[in-house]
Regions:
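Proteolytic maturation boundary segments
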Residues: 2-36, 218-259, 270, 301, ...
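Active-site His/Glu-centered metal-binding helix of metallohydrolases
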Residues: 65-73, 287
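Non-catalytic, conformational "gating/processing" segments within enzyme and secreted inhibitor domains
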Residues: 136, 143, 197-229, 430
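PPIase-associated folding chaperone regions across multiple families
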Residues: 279-287, 304, 415-417, 430
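His/Glu-based metal-binding/catalytic segments typifying zinc-dependent metallopeptidases
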Residues: 151, 156, 167-168, 238-296
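M16 family metallopeptidases and their MPP-like homologs
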Residues: 37, 42-60, 64-68, 82-129, ...
Length: 452
């Protein structure tokens, strides 16, 4: 889970508890899973579709396809001309978006209650009838859009190649997480129309998707509309088996340097840890929050407030379906070197391994997580509302209403748990990447204890 940004004031037994989400789930004959959740508090509905495909389902030499289709899915289908998808939704007062990760692709529409039929028709048409309009001109257009996105967000932005550099060092070349979600320029350029169409046929079929509807609707009407628009879409081919992968291990500390067009050096520490919903994930999230989540966290107080050697610090446990990492990220303040930051990071990590965390730190983080879950449940849709949560847990653990149990596992974390995972994972070999201004490779960290 991402590092926390908001800390709640609620404490003790009187704190609001995370409720269980009521839902109904069923499956159409073509394999499409449907999840319904009624909430009549406001006249709003969110339609949220998850396809169980991400960059982790791609192959070396064919990267970037999942993210490419995130764009293509907004470019019209057999009964929806190019440009009309957004126009029709905007005219109805709706908002929509999509996103791609290593593990899944999702799309949502947030709209007034009376526009449910419109959203379902649009989503069904692009799921079932996109390929008849898919030609080389459309592929080339979106290929150029994505390549430009890569230039602006990765290749030509300060620190933009950090993730790609770390992934290549951390994972074997054949591992599905060894390349970035956006793919490589070479693979995007080489993508053939037939290859892209085949990818869509396999992964964007109803038997590889879940449709979640949350908000102010009548369930009988919703079921009728879902059947009307989605039932005729044929089931896709048998999905290729996903590989069973051993946990990632690093034999020894690996020190990397990346010269970039930046003014300030930045250091990233990355340890291989656990995949999503592993028993150690919640303690690792708590550990990250104690180290570097806000102004009260240990690294922030030492590096940003007391010593004033860092401009920013963060820590996070990032868990995916196949693997996970624990990462600390530090940006040096002008006039300070990475070695100055490294000394404090090592001290604080060892202090935590040796002495654990305080009861107050644990309580503070638990309160923040309770607040985080409650804030997500306060929203119907979007990337973090109830419609998306139902899809997230349905995919991750097979239970759409897992949010209550997910919140509970953070409340069960003990100080001993946090100390245990700190020792178990942060005592192991890691990737250390130093990003330095061009021509300043002498600033890089080259050993445990700093530069030589």
């Amino acid at each position: 889970m991402a590092a926390l940004a908001i800390f709640a004031a609620a404490t003790g037994a009187g704190a609001q508890q995370v409720p269980r989400l009521k839902f109904e789930k069923y499956t159409l004959p073509n394999g499409l899973e449907v999840i319904l959740h009624e909430d009549h508090s406001t006249p709003i509905i969110s339609v949220n579709t998850w396809f169980k495909v991400g960059s982790g389902d791609e192959k070396p030499g064919r990267t970037g396809f999942a993210h490419l289709f995130e764009h293509i899915m907004f470019m019209g289908s057999q009964h929806v001309p190019v440009g009309d998808f957004d126009k029709l939704l905007e005219a109805a007062g709706a908002t929509n978006n999509g996103s791609t990760t290593e593990d899944r692709t999702n799309y949502y529409e947030n709209l007034p209650s009376n526009a449910l039929a419109l959203a379902l028709w649009l989503d069904a048409d692009r799921m079932g009838y996109l390929l008849p309009t898919m030609d080389l001109a459309k592929l080339d257009l979106q290929r150029d859009v994505v390549k430009n996105e890569r230039r602006q967000s990765y290749d030509n932005v300060p620190y933009g190649l950090v993730d790609e550099t770390i992934l290549k060092a951390l994972y074997p070349k054949s591992h599905p997480y060894s390349w970035p979600v956006i793919g490589s320029m070479a693979d995007l350029s080489a993508a053939a129309l037939d290859d892209v169409k085949d990818f869509f046929r396999i992964y964007y079929a109803p038997n590889n998707a879940t449709l979640s509807i949350a908000g102010d609707f009548d369930p009988k009407e919703a079921k009728m509309l879902v059947a009307k628009y989605f039932s005729a879409i044929p089931r896709g081919p048998k999905l290729p088996p996903r590989p069973s992968l051993a946990p990632i291990k690093i034999a020894k500390d690996t020190f990397l340097v990346l010269e970039d067009k930046v003014q300030l050096p930045r250091v990233f520490y990355t340890w291989p840890t656990v995949k999503a919903y592993n028993a150690d994930e919640a303690p690792l999230d708590v550990l990250a929050a104690v180290l570097a989540s806000d102004k009260n966290s240990r690294l922030y107080k030492r590096l940003v407030y007391d010593l004033q050697t860092a401009q920013s610090v963060s820590a996070s446990q990032q868990s995916g379906r196949l693997a996970g990492i624990f990462q600390i990220d530090l940006l040096a303040k002008p006039g300070n070197k990475p070695v100055d930051l490294d000394k404090i990071v090592r001290e604080e990590v060892q202090r935590l391994i040796a002495g654990g965390i305080t009861p107050r730190e644990l309580e503070r983080v638990k309160n923040s997580y309770r607040s985080l879950f409650l804030n997500q449940l306060a929203s119907i849709g979007g990337f973090g509302g109830k419609a998306n949560l139902l899809n997230q847990y349905n995919y991750g653990v097979g239970t759409p209403d897992y949010v209550q149990e997910d919140a509970a596992r953070y409340q069960r974390v003990t100080r001993a748990d946090v100390q245990r995972v700190a020792k178990k994972y942060l005592s192991t070999p890691k990737i250390v990447l130093t990003v330095v201004p061009e021509g300043k490779t002498d600033l890089k960290l080259t050993s445990i204890g700093g530069d030589r």
